[in-house]
Amino acid sequence: MGTQTLQMEKVKTLPVILGEVDILKTLQLLPGVQSSGEGNSGFYVRGGGPDQNLVLLDEATVYNSGHLFGFFSVFNSDAINSVTLIKGGMPAEYGGRLSSVVNVNMKEGNNQTYHATGGVGLIASRLTLEGPIQKGKSSFMMAARRTYIDALIKPFVSSTSTLSGSGYYFYDLNLKLNYQFSDKDRVFFSGYFGKDQFVFQGERFGIKFPWGNSTTTMRWNHLFNEKLFMNTTVLFSDYIFKIGASQSNFNFELFSGVRDYSTKVDFDYFPNIRNQVKFGGAYTFHTFTPTTATGTIGETSISPEKINRQYEKYVTKFK
């Protein structure tokens, strides 16, 4: 009862907002899940806050799962195969979270034929390509999405206006490659790159708000026998947030971010058809950069003597 898996074919049959299918908004329709605000992709699970949910994309942590200050999620529906929500009794392999685990899996691509899908919405368009690299053995999937809010607003702003350089947009890029070496070995690589960019440009004053996520996953699947299966995974996750301001000969920037390097090995053992035993271990090198300020006034630079970064290492074993 605490775990629910949704396939994208069913999710796409639900009504959508502004032409965009949103996985996280769909999860808000499930029992025990409540929206954090009207039209917002953040959600509460059994009383826990949105920041207490562990959001994973092909096992890599996504620290900010929203675009446009949470109005859209970062997950392009055309690139997603399924999403699993664990609301209670989270397995030890996830490292523990107070509220829930959202595990999103990307499509692996068709290894037989080529396909192209896309869509044009009110504020964003998307395109997905997939097909075989070596027929029957390897495949690829590439997906891109970009909003054109900046292009929609541009006709309403005069080219001579002091706000002509202002605007907002976001984009997502998804990539997945997989190769089957044998009946017992398979390797895949997946990556996600997304960014939001808000720019306000006045006659004498300008400000920029860029922020975004990047994730990378490399995994080796090995089948020892019909009862024992192994996954070896290397993960990278990065989130950055910046605020930049400029006026005349003055420039100022605030930067903060989170970066993870992880590796994990897990085994699945099936002693019989009714039981499954899962065990393994994981290591994470975690870097947290609190808000760091830099700036220039004319030819004078202002910067901290030392950037205050926090480094942490985690070693986890589970069974």
Regions found by a protein language model. Give the residues of each.
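Periplasmic N-terminal accessory/gating domains of Gram-negative outer-membrane beta-barrel systems
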Residues: 1-90, 101, 107-108
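Outer-membrane beta-barrel domain signature
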Residues: 13, 70, 114-116, 160-165, ...
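Face-selective signature of the C-terminal outer-membrane beta-barrel domain
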Residues: 178-195, 210-319
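Strand-connecting loop/turn motifs
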Residues: 52, 78, 111-113, 133-137, ...
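Hydrophobic, lipid-facing positions within transmembrane beta-strands of outer-membrane proteins
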Residues: 23, 41, 98-100, 114-116, ...
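Extracytoplasmic loops and strand-loop junctions of Gram-negative outer membrane beta-barrel proteins
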Residues: 7-9, 65-66, 85-86, 109-112, ...
